[in-house]
């Protein structure tokens, strides 16, 4: 089969997420301590998760559901019962600064993206989160020269697996489902969304247990560089 475009998820597909998230939360906690909040790390994590749960519940299915500034804002509100804009900004900025500083592409990602482009394929990043943050990540990772299109869920108002997250980048690149590959680490977002529209789906960096009860991807790979063996 001849492909014309490859769509990649960003977070935990092109770089490892857990280490970045941990660095961000640690920095936010340290900032909270400097601001006078009497939180142990465990207490901070509990407050952060409480704020996160509320945001996820209220904003499910939107890009803002992932916004750490909202998590920090809500955590402070729940803890203090008051509005503290400067503190919420400080914690959110500390989180993202440390997160981005920790980011590093998985081995072989740049070489793989370059090989795909050299073979004439369009490369897109299709990601669930707000645009400013994802632009910051793209810049920090040096991906612009290797990616033809970035689409965030903030741009569509819907999150993967919503069809618009796949149909819009296909329309912009002038390709159809049978010509397009979706590569990601999420069965529910990347694989299910791609499968529903007839894209070829590739699951990477994911545990086998994630597939239980779900339709299978067309291919499974352990790392992004293996993609060239599948597609080229």
Predicted feature residues:
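Short, acidic loop-to-helix structural element flanking the phosphoryl-transfer center
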Residues: 86, 97-123, 226
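Active-site neighborhood of HAD-like aspartate-dependent phosphohydrolases
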Residues: 1-8, 13-47
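Short, surface-exposed acidic
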Residues: 33-46, 79-92, 146
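A metal-dependent, Asp-based hydrolase signature
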Residues: 54-94
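Conserved phosphate-coordination/catalytic loops
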Residues: 66, 103-107, 159-160
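Alpha-helical substrate-recognition element adjacent to the catalytic core
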Residues: 36-66
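Hydrophobic alpha-helical core bundles mediating ligand binding, dimerization, or RNAP-core interactions
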Residues: 21-29, 47-52, 72, 92-99, ...
């Amino acid at each position: 089969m001849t492909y014309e475009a490859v769509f990649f998820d960003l977070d935990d597909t092109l770089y490892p997420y857990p280490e970045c998230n941990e660095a961000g939360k640690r920095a936010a906690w340290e900032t909270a301590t400097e601001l006078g909040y009497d939180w142990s790390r465990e207490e901070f994590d509990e407050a952060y998760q409480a704020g996160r749960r509320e945001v996820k519940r209220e904003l499910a299915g939107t890009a803002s559901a992932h916004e750490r500034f909202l998590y920090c804002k809500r955590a402070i509100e729940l803890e203090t019962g008051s509005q503290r804009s400067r503190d919420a900004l400080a914690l959110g900025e500390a989180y993202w600064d440390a997160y981005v500083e920790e980011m590093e592409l998985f081995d072989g990602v740049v070489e793989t993206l370059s090989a795909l482009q050299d073979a004439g394929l369009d490369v897109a990043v299709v990601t669930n989160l707000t645009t400013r943050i994802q632009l910051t990540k793209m810049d920090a990772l040096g991906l612009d020269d290797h990616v033809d299109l970035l689409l965030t869920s903030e741009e569509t108002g819907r999150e993967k697996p919503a069809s618009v997250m796949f149909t819009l980048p296909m329309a912009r690149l002038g390709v159809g489902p049978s010509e397009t590959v979706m590569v990601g680490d999420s069965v529910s977002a990347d694989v299910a969304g791609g499968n529903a529209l007839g894209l070829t789906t590739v699951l990477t960096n994911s545990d086998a247990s994630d597939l239980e009860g779900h339709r299978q991807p067309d291919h499974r790979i352990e790392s992004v560089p293996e993609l060239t063996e599948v597609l080229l």
